[in-house]
């Protein structure tokens, strides 16, 4: 028996009964004018329709968004108000960078475990196309002062102090606030620190695209992705548009390094692209799901989050969170049928795989006697990963949960690990179970 019981006080498990996502679209393509809140409404509305559940039965929505929009600071509540749920449905938003929808799922699960609710929805949405574009500090101060002036002369005097540079928009920050380092720079550092070659990174990216293309071709992804009709409703998107359907390994070598032009190995092709999309799952108390006659996709067996330093190895979160989740589930790496790791960068993914198998890392960093073990690649990211599908930050966790549960079902059940790194030196891991 594990150290963690994801059950209600009466012993009922937390069941996942539905999962759905929009297609994932590269930045400034099909979802180029669609804000994250609308992507979130779109997927939740469709998921409820597919389960044929009365929206009024939903008691809680926990949703996340990493790229925040000032006009909709609580995306979860906007989704409730825009999808026909009861106005009394509780809703709040969370953010844990790239692990946001894992956090949303855990929060709903814990509400069910506590007996506060029977049914909840968790997920996330992000748009890398519809962004909050800032202004310079001087312009912001001038605009604030302008609102308090009374005469035309006062207004003109204020405006005359602004230079052309002050009027230029300020693009969204891509670096860590605390360190000034971007995710790509950290991936480059990890590639060098852990001797991850360019060839290894390109090979993993090629593998991811090849497996994702194969999964789509075999119809394995179709039922977990809705057809989206973004405004003005003149076109639709029904599959991810980042996947290289005819990926060729030799083509990856043609790209130049993106973050260290002279000595680097991290490129646009072995990194996940900026992406727009949304994903959601529906969780229920096990007995409630059976009472409503809903098919149970699977259960959350355990979960863990970890936090590490941000100056180096910031994307090593899976190597810290995974051993905790395995211990809490009372299992080992060898007990898993599937392992799905978020591929932010090929370098980060490969570095974590190395540390999974490193006794030295386990002893020096984790205080464990030995490593959790080497990953059997026949179990790893078997349908491809984020390098192929793309990565709308807050949506990736819910995509992984749904995709993993469906693949476990096809294989006759078992246990699976979902794990992700996240900005700020965070990591998430979740053990899923299908009977």
Swiss-Prot record:
Catalyzes the final step of fatty acid oxidation in which acetyl-CoA is released and the CoA ester of a fatty acid two carbons shorter is formed. The keyword Aminoacyl-tRNA synthetase does not apply. Heterotetramer of two alpha chains (FadJ) and two beta chains (FadI). GO terms for cellular component: cytosol. InterPro entries: Ac-CoA_C-AcTrfase_FadI (IPR012806), Thiolase (IPR002155), Thiolase-like (IPR016039), Thiolase_C (IPR020617), Thiolase_CS (IPR020613), Thiolase_N (IPR020616). Its main location: cytoplasm. This is 3-ketoacyl-CoA thiolase. Belongs to the thiolase-like superfamily. Thiolase family. It holds the Pfam family Thiolase_N. Pathway: Lipid metabolism; fatty acid beta-oxidation. It is found in: Cytoplasm. Signal peptide: none annotated. GO terms for molecular function: acetyl-CoA C-acetyltransferase activity. It is an enzyme of class 2 (transferase). It comes from the Bacteria. The active site is at 98 (acyl-thioester intermediate), 391 (proton acceptor), 421 (proton acceptor). Its EC number is 2.3.1.16. GO terms for biological process: fatty acid beta-oxidation. PROSITE patterns: THIOLASE_2. Keywords: Acyltransferase, Cytoplasm, Fatty acid metabolism, Lipid degradation, Lipid metabolism, Transferase. The keyword Acyltransferase applies. It catalyses: an acyl-CoA + acetyl-CoA = a 3-oxoacyl-CoA + CoA.
